[in-house]
């Protein structure tokens, strides 16, 4: 942000022999007011600088936290196998996992969860609910360990973007259900990357603000994945003509 000195349009002071500042308009600013102006300008300058510095610091701190949450758990994979390592990553993010023939495992409101999943070293994870989690591109390394994953929910994940979707192809043989509802950074380009997932049976693409034409996008996705039920979008959404695009009837009215 530019310092407020310019916006106030100060001009160079000129001395006219009196105590004060003589401006170009001819008015003399008393010395007391001059000091007040300088203090105010200094305060504004310091204030704006501090806000920018604080904003940058908070942003950097938040990104560091996201990076830490998405670090690789290779050491866990080596000790406990890919299923337990992948499950631990999701549970630490606040998500839930379901091992084959087991009940869902979810963290409580304090983030604590049962350690029993460490005993499921040889049991595949068949479903993951990562809704509202801070998974990003790097964190997918831990999720892609789950080669038998059948159901994946990434609803409202703020860091899931088009690049993330381009990495899901290793799950093509197993993944049958995928929800991307409410992901703010997913656009048509990312959805086009899902053509690898030909075993999908259900895909939720509702509430994607980065998709410019939801109706047309759903039609194209349905053609790309003919065996998949695409839900969440009214097929006519984005295809209806607005008032300014509708043809005007210029014919003369028929007399009664």
Curated annotation (Swiss-Prot):
InterPro entries the UniProt entry points to: LRR_dom_sf
Any one Gene Ontology BP term: mitochondrial respiratory chain complex I assembly
Main location: mitochondrion
GO cellular component: mitochondrion
Name this protein carries in UniProt: Distal membrane-arm assembly complex protein 2
Record localization: Mitochondrion
UniProt xrefs under Gene3D superfamilies: Ribonuclease Inhibitor
Modification type Phosphoserine: residues: 252
Chain's role: Required for the assembly of the mitochondrial NADH:ubiquinone oxidoreductase complex (complex I). Involved in the assembly of the distal region of complex I.
Lineage of the organism: Eukaryota, Metazoa, Chordata, Craniata, Vertebrata
Family assignment from sequence similarity: Belongs to the ATP synthase subunit s family.
């Amino acid at each position: 942000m530019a310092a407020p000195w310019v916006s106030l349009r100060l001009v160079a002071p000129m001395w006219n022999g009196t105590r004060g500042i003589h401006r170009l308009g001819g008015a003399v600013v008393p010395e007391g007011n001059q000091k007040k102006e300088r203090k105010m300008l200094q305060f504004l300058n310091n204030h704006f600088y501090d806000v920018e510095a604080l904003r940058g610091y908070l942003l950097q701190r938040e990104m560091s936290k996201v990076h830490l949450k998405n670090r690789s758990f290779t050491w866990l994979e080596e000790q406990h196998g890919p299923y337990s390592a992948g499950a631990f990553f999701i549970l630490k993010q606040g998500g839930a996992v379901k091992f084959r023939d087991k009940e869902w495992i979810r963290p409580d409101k304090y983030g604590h969860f049962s350690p029993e999943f460490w005993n499921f070293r040889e049991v595949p994870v068949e479903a993951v609910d990562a809704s509202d989690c801070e998974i990003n591109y790097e964190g997918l390394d831990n999720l892609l360990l789950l080669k038998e994953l059948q159901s994946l929910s990434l609803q409202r994940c703020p860091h899931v973007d088009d690049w993330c979707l381009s990495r899901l192809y290793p799950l093509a043989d197993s993944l049958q259900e995928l929800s991307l509802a409410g992901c703010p950074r997913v656009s048509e380009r990312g959805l086009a990357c899902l053509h690898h997932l030909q075993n999908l049976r259900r895909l939720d693409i509702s509430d994607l603000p980065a998709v410019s034409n939801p109706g047309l996008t759903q039609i194209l996705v349905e053609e790309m994945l003919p065996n998949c039920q695409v839900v969440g979008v009214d097929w006519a959404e984005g295809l209806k003509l607005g008032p300014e695009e509708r043809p005007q009837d210029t014919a003369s009215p028929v007399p009664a």
